[in-house]
């Protein structure tokens, strides 16, 4: 039987699959961005291109320290405002997670401060992204409102780089998303210096999967590319977990108690909904998964948090991770157990909404699928493409469209067990395709299972289940899109 995956050149297919669909992501191809790795970048010219005038840098620094966007000393305000040509071509700030990237974190911070300025590099252990958005950008906007053309241009041209992993990038994107809620139209685009483990957000927008060995020269090239790279769009997805009265034990950072239970009433859940429900909400940019993969991740994270001395490097991490997979039956289910009994169809129902459709539609949970993933990006699990690059005739047959990270659709697929997942991640076969959807609702009901395991962008948690009432996990697109700098 023919594979649904296209058999054209693999390297070419990976490149196409990871490219956002926006037209402006293609406009810089002729500008030589792909060859910038071989072009020397002058340090002085780069500094002039990125560094904001001193009076603006100091004003923003003071406002952030005082947590007051109006605390601008008079001596830092230029009489009559500044002329527009004082604004740099691409004013930039960098957020760095010093705990990422091993020993590179602190020295990278120092290198960035040398290339730009100390005031434009923010240590995330000292300045949080929401503080910069509220007080730093707020300061810039207040100075611009006083007639300062330089401040106005800096605010309009501002770009942000994040040195960290996917979790750090998502943190910054989430804080910038608050500008949309406040009705702000100028949202700074974000680029990535990959310091994490998976770095799937970084891979998806051309910033690579790891920090380069020759990092000193690479930092200059990266900042130069970020100053001129095209802007692409990225969907983000809101998750709402509605459960019987109780609490999630040790919820991840990205999952917060919801003020209101805003479960979509378009699908009648009255029979199975508890009289008093507890709700949690969060936002993800890459994926949400339910099942054995999340259970293995939860066990590994719990061990790493309680016994960090056992997980001190990538090799030991992989050994421990694999042992968890085997001990919990992900790779080797005990013979006394029927693998089908561990299938998610025993505890789960799935409903989806298709594009431009207000009605929920129930879809079947495939037999023996033990992990289900709702994926936004093409890159998953450190650069794999589990959805695959599907042939046009297969797309038409299944009613799918080519997947992009800005198309308002999320891809849903399943893994049967660890070996199946391993072959999928090696791109030898495709995952079990289930659906493409504009909204998803998972309904979980415990039987012999007391808990389900979920993870969102790499953060796992244990989700208690009831045998009497259902737990609902609803995914909907966030109304606004994030802006990313595309290093194509």
From Swiss-Prot:
Q: What are its E.C. numbers?
A: 2.7.1.107
Q: Superkingdom of this entry's organism?
A: Eukaryota
Q: Which Pfam families match?
A: DAGK_acc, DAGK_cat
The protein's matches in InterPro entries, at most eight in alphabetical order, are given as: ATP-NAD_kinase_N (IPR017438), DGK (IPR037607), Diacylglycerol_kin_accessory (IPR000756), Diacylglycerol_kinase_cat_dom (IPR001206), Diacylglycerol_kinase_pln (IPR016961), NAD/diacylglycerol_kinase_sf (IPR016064)
Reactions mediated catalytically = a 1,2-diacyl-sn-glycerol + ATP = a 1,2-diacyl-sn-glycero-3-phosphate + ADP + H(+)
Could you provide one GO biological process annotation from this protein's UniProt record? Answer: phospholipase C-activating G protein-coupled receptor signaling pathway
Question: Is 4Fe-4S one of the keywords?
Answer: no
Q: Where is this region: Disordered?
A: 1-24
Which SMART domains does the record match to this protein? DAGKa, DAGKc
Q: Which UniProt keywords apply?
A: ATP-binding, Kinase, Nucleotide-binding, Plant defense, Stress response, Transferase
Residues in DAGKc domain copies = 87-245
| One Gene Ontology term, aspect cellular component | plasmodesma
| GO MF terms held by the record | ATP binding; ATP-dependent diacylglycerol kinase activity
Q: What biological function has been recorded for the protein in this entry?
A: Phosphorylates the second messenger diacylglycerol (DAG) to generate phosphatidic acid (PA), another important signaling molecule. PA is required for plant development and responses to abiotic stress and pathogen attack. May be involved in the accumulation of PA during cold stress.
Official protein name in the record: Diacylglycerol kinase 3
Organism equals: Arabidopsis thaliana (Mouse-ear cress)
Q: Please name the taxonomic classification of the source.
A: Eukaryota, Viridiplantae, Streptophyta, Embryophyta, Tracheophyta
């Amino acid at each position: 039987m023919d594979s649904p995956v296209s058999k054209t050149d693999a390297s070419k297919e990976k490149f196409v699959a990871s490219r956002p669909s926006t037209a402006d992501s293609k406009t810089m191809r002729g500008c030589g961005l792909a060859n910038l790795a071989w072009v020397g970048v002058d340090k002085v010219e780069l500094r002039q291109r990125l560094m904001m005038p001193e009076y603006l840098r100091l004003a923003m620094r003071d406002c952030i320290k005082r947590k007051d966007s109006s605390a601008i000393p008079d001596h830092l305000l230029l009489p009559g405002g500044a002329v527009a040509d004082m604004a740099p071509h691409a004013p930039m700030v960098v957020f760095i997670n010093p705990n990422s990237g091993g020993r590179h974190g602190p020295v990278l911070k120092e290198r960035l401060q040398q290339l730009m300025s100390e005031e434009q590099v923010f240590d995330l252990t000292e300045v949080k992204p929401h503080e910069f958005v509220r007080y730093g950008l707020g300061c810039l906007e207040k100075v611009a409102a006083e007639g300062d053309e330089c401040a106005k241009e800096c605010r309009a041209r501002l770009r942000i780089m994040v040195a960290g992993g996917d979790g750090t990038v998502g943190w910054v994107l989430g804080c910038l998303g608050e500008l949309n809620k406040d009705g702000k139209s100028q949202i700074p685009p974000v680029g990535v210096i990959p310091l994490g483990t998976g770095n799937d957000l970084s891979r998806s927008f051309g910033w690579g999967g790891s920090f380069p060995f020759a990092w000193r020269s690479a930092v200059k090239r990266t900042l130069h590319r970020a100053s001129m790279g095209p802007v692409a769009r990225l969907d983000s997805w809101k998750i709402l977990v509605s459960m019987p009265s109780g609490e999630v034990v040790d919820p991840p950072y990205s999952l917060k108690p919801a003020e209101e239970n805003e479960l979509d009433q378009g699908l009648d859940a009255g029979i199975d909904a508890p009289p008093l429900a507890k709700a949690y909400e969060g936002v993800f940019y890459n994926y949400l998964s339910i099942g054995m993969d999340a259970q293995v991740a939860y066990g590994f994270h719990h061990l790493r948090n309680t016994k960090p001395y056992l997980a001190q490097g990538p090799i030991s991490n992989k050994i421990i991770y694999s042992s968890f997979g085997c001990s919990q039956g992900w790779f080797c289910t005990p013979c006394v157990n029927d693998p089908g009994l561990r299938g998610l169809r025993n505890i789960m129902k799935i409903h989806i909404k298709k594009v431009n459709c207000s009605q929920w539609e129930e879809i079947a949970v495939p037999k023996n699928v033990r992990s289900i993933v709702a994926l936004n990006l093409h890159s998953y699990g450190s650069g794999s493409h589990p959805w695959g690059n599907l042939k046009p005739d297969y797309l038409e047959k299944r009613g799918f469209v080519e997947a992009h990270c800005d198309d308002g659709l999320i891809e849903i697929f399943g893994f049967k067990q660890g070996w199946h997942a391993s072959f999928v991640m090696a791109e030898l076969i495709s995952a079990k395709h289930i659906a493409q959807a504009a909204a998803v609702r998972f309904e979980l009901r415990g039987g012999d299972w007391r808990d389900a395991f979920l993870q969102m962008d790499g953060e796992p948690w244990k989700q208690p289940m009831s045998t009497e009432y259902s737990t609902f996990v609803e995914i909907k697109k966030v109304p606004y899109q994030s802006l990313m700098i595309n290093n194509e």
